[in-house]
Amino acid sequence: MLTFIIGLVILIGGAALYGRFCEKVFGPDDRKTPAYTKEDGVDFVPMKGWKNSLINLLNIAGTGPILGPIQGILFGPIAFLTIPIGNVIGGAMHDYFSGMICLRDGGTQMPEMIRRYSTKGIYKFYNVFVCVLLLLVGAVFIYTPGDIAATQLFGFDGKATSVSTWVIYGVIFLYYLIATVFPIDAIIGKIYPIFGGILLFSAIGIFIGIFVTGMPLMNIWDSWAAPVLSLTGADGTVGTFTYADYFSTKHFLPIFFVTVACGILSGFHSTQTAIISRTMKSERQGRNTFYNMMVLEGFIAMVWAAGAMGVYNLALQEPNAGLATGTVGVVCKYLLGHVGGIIALLGVIVLPITSGDTALRALRLSLSETLHIDQSTNGKRIKLAVPIFALVIAILVFAKTNADGFNILWRYFAWANQTLSLFAFLCITAWMFENGKGKWAWIPMIPGCFYTFICVTYIANAHIGFNIPWTPAYIIGVACAVAYVVACCMYGKKRAAKLLAK
């Protein structure tokens, strides 16, 4: 339990110190924001600070900070330290600078930010990559809340052959269409406070439940070799699960960081902070809206990691049995009882839905900005949304009807999500050099270098990637990480030199 508490102190204390430091480096001021200078009643709409913060939290927090930590905690209590450290210096910093640069540049979406602060080749590649990721996000965030609702809320079997499964998908899909097309304040701004209440109840309820029930949480200095429980394999053999075995055999680097994903860092978040940059009344709201909301997502990840470890150690749920979604229900009902568990499950369902809707909205905005498509009327917005939703349906059908479809979808989603952050780190570095802040370029380059290693090593070894053995995969990862830092420095200094020449 003490390691968990230390992790929370690192998260909260680190955020207070490093968040203020990042704010000082950026230098927010009192200039008029795009919400006023470009107000259109649809996407550029001034909204209150608390509402922007809540909407951003719900936008960025999907199933990642729940399902990721539930699987990531299998590596042991080291997760209680790596999640907060990575969140503070990586994820929250990424969200803050991405959102603030978009805000400072007139409420631009991420493709435009990439165009301004990188090369034409990177810009073109990013446009394709981000569109694919947002489609994957839309599909994943229909699939996961739909299945949790079907199996754990309504008691259906959740199979592809069941009409109930597709009816639930259809309801979520219809909401996504409405939220993608209509004015942000009319739909998202009105319903999100309700969703936020459910989310906060579930997260805080589980957090309190961990202490009230005295869940057995392992410390980093405890013996990781103690058997947690007996497992019966598919072949009938009986074995034991230990955190030590999992840590030593499952390649903590890079698997842990790709698995936990959103609780530490998510490239997807930059597409969401760009949306909120259009509704903020003041630049000075940025730290709370962007940085602190990512820290709050880190708190959610910590809570679910602890809840999962508790039920594993109590042998209430087998770590390797079934989907991580099964552990969600066990944690909720054990800690909060039947009624509280249902409300907590609603919170788990709300999280991905409130990310999926704005993911598809971000895709529409990005396409319209990149291709210069007029979005002034509902009809024109629907016209662009139709092909987007057709592709999401196709991905969803594949994931649901193929035996290994969702596993393939989730792996590509998780890897692409982390990889997308590398584009933002590059542009943040370039922005710093261009704005006379080159001495602070290490802020984005450290996590950028680390995640280049993580993402390249993972895809080099993965069966869904190049299927290269681990040793050469690690070598390739290190080489690419070094090359990333060199490229960032050279490109940043080149931009700074051009600026001085002018």
Where in this protein do the model-derived segments appear?
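Loop-to-transmembrane helix boundary motifs in multi-pass membrane proteins
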Residues: 123-127, 162-170, 292-302, 308-319, ...
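Extracellular loop-to-transmembrane helix junctions
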Residues: 1-19, 72-102, 111, 341, ...
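Extracellular/periplasmic helix-exit of transmembrane alpha-helices
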Residues: 99, 210-240, 284, 292-330, ...
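Helix-loop-helix module between adjacent transmembrane segments
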Residues: 10-11, 15, 90-106, 110-180, ...
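Membrane-interface "cap" regions at the ends of multi-pass membrane proteins
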Residues: 10-66, 282-285
